[in-house]
Amino acid sequence: MAIINKGMSRRSFLGLTGSVAAVAGLGLTGCGGSSSDEGSAASSTDSANRGGGVITAGSAYAPSSFDPASTGSAVGLGANWHVVEGLYGIDYHDYSTFNELATDDPKSVDDTTFEVTIRKGAKFSDGTEVTADDVVASYTACAASATYAPFFQPFESIEAKDASTVTVKTKVPNFSLLKDRLAIIRVTPATQTEEDRAKQPIGSGPWMYDSISDTEITLVPNPEYNGEYAAEDKKIQYSILTDPTARVTAQQEGSTLVMELVTADAVDQLESAGCKIDNVQGFGTRFIMFNVAKEPWNDVKVRQAVMYALDTEKMVSNTFAGLATAASCYLPKSFTNYHEASTVYKTDAKKAKKLIEESGITPGAITLRTTDNEQIKGMAAQVKNDLDALGFDVTIQTDTSPATYAAIDGGEAYDILLAPGDPSCFGADPDLLLNWWYGDNVWMQTRCPWKESAEWQKLHGLMDEALAAEGDEQQKKWNECFDIIADNAVLYPVVHVKTVSASWGDPSTAPTARPSMASRALARRACPSGALRPSRRKTRLSLYAGCRPLGPYPHS
């Protein structure tokens, strides 16, 4: 999929290999591999002496649950990719899939039945063998998750044929996205409890968790790993630096080799210090959600009035310093399946006021809930100004993502939510992206209870038709979906952001960092959501900055 900034040179993004939610991602070579094109930044001396160091990263997001079957923790998702393998992995540069635990592509038995064989000798870091029963148990946990379940609606079942083979049955004949969906299932031991998975999952990947705390996450090599990309350094260390000033300071001083979410005002500062700055336009949204169970938000005219009242140009200029784009579709223009929606919310104060008049309501006091994401807080001030001008009396209530969603899930009668989100860490096809927020899940059932509406039913009918179609007919169905969600605006992107990452292009020049030879071969790759993620050629440091908020543990 054409989702990365094609203007970036190969030299700027050496060995591009990862990209999802969408933006600049920089990876540190921490694992070996057979590909030669990924290590070209290192000299022959580097190659002979690589490894043995510590890879450090500044994470903008605090951890919560690490359960691979349900986590919505941005940093947890990224770290898990190094620790917990799936049958397949996703190369986030182009969303292609590659083998992890699987030895080959799924073997077709018939149009809806496929078999996948597990890598011989694969073991979890606790020394137990990976079996088909572990795959089945992991799938069952994912499919039972309130938020992951929509991803697996095309599946009929996954069963163990024998100890090393699973049989996958699909509802959609010749399901073209089979490997993509299987890649979402990260395999943990069937014996590991949900509680233990949430604290510290066990995996079969090149790395394993050494420790997890509120301030630091440490990964060390998995001695049981027998795959292609064994860990070469002795440690990956994520420093949890949610405060942007602390994160920038750590990067500037060299305490971290790479950081995510560089704020616009820190770009020049870090460049002057010698850091490499990269950004890529991606799916990463800053979205607005209405409590449609509460008046007046059950009236589409009121929701549309709010959307037209928002001065997105000021937000893009003032909050993002130009590093964002106002939404003209559910997908950003850089995505292959983009199609301008029938309704595009360009700022129009007169139209907003007319819609309020037509609705017959009298604007009153409302609460704008926001997460504590710095960009969201910046946007919130503009949203308040715009809605106050429309006649509302807006009070901003800011909290952490876990606290915000806990309150909403607990039944709080909120008015409007402004938050970040990006499901493209799971894939980039429109069906997956649509199902994240508009699927039969916690979002449409309780957070934004639109599920019982005729419009939602029509949307899902079109989504089902699109999944079974191909080519132009499939795109036509998706375009209709984009129009429905834009017209109704129950939950919709305000902007798609460009996420900015910083790294020491030559980590040996960092003021206080003492990287290994492997780390000096710093390899960059674009991550459509701005996260640092693994690649098919070499596992990369994975911050997963672009993916949020997810499920019961949304991070923003």
Language model segments and positions:
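N-terminal lobe/hinge region of extracytoplasmic solute-binding protein
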Residues: 58-109, 140, 202
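Gly/Pro-rich hinge or "lid" segments in bacterial periplasmic/extracellular proteins
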Residues: 93, 181-231, 235
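Alpha-helical secondary-structure segments
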Residues: 131-138, 163-167, 205-206, 233-235, ...
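Surface-exposed binding/hinge segments that line
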Residues: 150-190
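Ligand-site clamp/hinge motif
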Residues: 195, 224-269
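Structural transition elements
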Residues: 321, 325-358, 374-378
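Extracytoplasmic/peripheral linker and loop segments enriched in polar/acidic and small residues
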Residues: 395-398, 402-404, 432-505
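Long beta-strand-rich cores associated with HINT superfamily self-processing modules
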Residues: 501-537
